[in-house]
Amino acid sequence: MDEQTRIELEAAAFRRLLQHLRDHTDVQNIDLMLLADFCRNCLAKWYGAAAKERGIEMEYPAAQEIIYGMPYAEWKAKYQKEATPEQLKAMEEIQRRKEAADH
Protein backbone atom coordinates (compact mmCIF):
# COMPACT_ATOMS: atom_id res chain seq x y z
CA MET A 1 0.00 0.00 0.00
CA ASP A 2 1.35 3.41 -0.90
CA GLU A 3 1.73 6.19 1.68
CA GLN A 4 -1.08 8.38 0.30
CA THR A 5 -3.58 5.52 0.38
CA ARG A 6 -2.56 4.69 3.96
CA ILE A 7 -3.08 8.30 5.00
CA GLU A 8 -6.50 8.41 3.32
CA LEU A 9 -7.59 5.18 5.01
CA GLU A 10 -6.42 6.46 8.40
CA ALA A 11 -8.30 9.72 7.84
CA ALA A 12 -11.45 7.82 6.86
CA ALA A 13 -11.20 5.63 9.98
CA PHE A 14 -10.70 8.74 12.14
CA ARG A 15 -13.76 10.43 10.63
CA ARG A 16 -15.76 7.29 11.30
CA LEU A 17 -14.55 7.22 14.92
CA LEU A 18 -15.63 10.85 15.37
CA GLN A 19 -19.04 10.13 13.89
CA HIS A 20 -19.39 7.08 16.12
CA LEU A 21 -18.62 9.19 19.20
CA ARG A 22 -21.05 11.88 18.04
CA ASP A 23 -23.77 9.26 17.53
CA HIS A 24 -23.16 7.77 20.98
CA THR A 25 -23.48 10.79 23.23
CA ASP A 26 -24.65 8.45 25.99
CA VAL A 27 -21.03 7.30 26.30
CA GLN A 28 -19.56 9.76 28.74
CA ASN A 29 -15.96 10.96 28.58
CA ILE A 30 -15.32 9.51 32.02
CA ASP A 31 -16.50 6.12 30.74
CA LEU A 32 -14.01 6.34 27.89
CA MET A 33 -11.23 7.36 30.29
CA LEU A 34 -11.96 4.50 32.65
CA LEU A 35 -12.09 1.90 29.88
CA ALA A 36 -9.61 3.16 27.30
CA ASP A 37 -7.53 5.88 28.98
CA PHE A 38 -8.59 8.50 26.42
CA CYS A 39 -11.70 10.57 25.73
CA ARG A 40 -13.04 13.17 23.33
CA ASN A 41 -10.97 15.87 25.05
CA CYS A 42 -7.82 13.78 24.56
CA LEU A 43 -8.64 13.56 20.85
CA ALA A 44 -9.05 17.35 20.75
CA LYS A 45 -5.65 17.80 22.41
CA TRP A 46 -4.02 15.36 19.98
CA TYR A 47 -5.71 17.12 17.05
CA GLY A 48 -4.46 20.51 18.22
CA ALA A 49 -0.95 19.14 18.75
CA ALA A 50 -0.94 17.67 15.23
CA ALA A 51 -1.99 21.07 13.86
CA LYS A 52 0.76 22.80 15.81
CA GLU A 53 3.36 20.32 14.51
CA ARG A 54 2.37 21.47 11.02
CA GLY A 55 2.61 25.16 11.89
CA ILE A 56 -1.16 25.64 12.19
CA GLU A 57 -2.29 27.67 15.19
CA MET A 58 -5.37 26.13 16.73
CA GLU A 59 -6.87 27.00 20.07
CA TYR A 60 -8.12 24.12 22.20
CA PRO A 61 -11.81 25.16 21.94
CA ALA A 62 -11.52 25.06 18.13
CA ALA A 63 -10.07 21.55 18.29
CA GLN A 64 -12.84 20.50 20.68
CA GLU A 65 -15.47 21.80 18.27
CA ILE A 66 -13.96 19.67 15.48
CA ILE A 67 -14.03 16.57 17.69
CA TYR A 68 -17.44 17.14 19.29
CA GLY A 69 -19.11 18.49 16.14
CA MET A 70 -20.29 21.50 18.14
CA PRO A 71 -18.88 23.87 20.76
CA TYR A 72 -17.86 21.91 23.85
CA ALA A 73 -20.07 24.01 26.15
CA GLU A 74 -23.09 23.10 24.03
CA TRP A 75 -22.19 19.37 24.04
CA LYS A 76 -21.61 19.47 27.79
CA ALA A 77 -24.96 21.14 28.44
CA LYS A 78 -26.83 18.68 26.22
CA TYR A 79 -25.11 15.39 26.99
CA GLN A 80 -22.71 15.40 29.92
CA LYS A 81 -24.00 13.75 33.07
CA GLU A 82 -22.70 14.13 36.58
CA ALA A 83 -19.98 11.57 37.33
CA THR A 84 -20.93 9.03 39.96
CA PRO A 85 -18.90 8.71 43.16
CA GLU A 86 -17.71 5.32 41.88
CA GLN A 87 -16.51 6.82 38.60
CA LEU A 88 -14.69 9.63 40.40
CA LYS A 89 -13.02 7.14 42.74
CA ALA A 90 -11.91 5.00 39.79
CA MET A 91 -10.48 8.09 38.02
CA GLU A 92 -8.57 9.06 41.16
CA GLU A 93 -7.08 5.56 41.30
CA ILE A 94 -6.01 5.76 37.66
CA GLN A 95 -4.40 9.14 38.31
CA ARG A 96 -2.54 7.75 41.33
CA ARG A 97 -1.21 4.84 39.24
CA LYS A 98 -0.11 7.18 36.46
CA GLU A 99 1.67 9.47 38.90
CA ALA A 100 3.37 6.49 40.57
CA ALA A 101 4.52 5.21 37.17
CA ASP A 102 5.97 8.64 36.28
CA HIS A 103 8.23 8.61 39.34
Q: What residue ranges belong to the model's regions?
A:
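Domain-level signature for proteins that mediate thiol-based redox and metal-cofactor handling
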Residues: 1-103
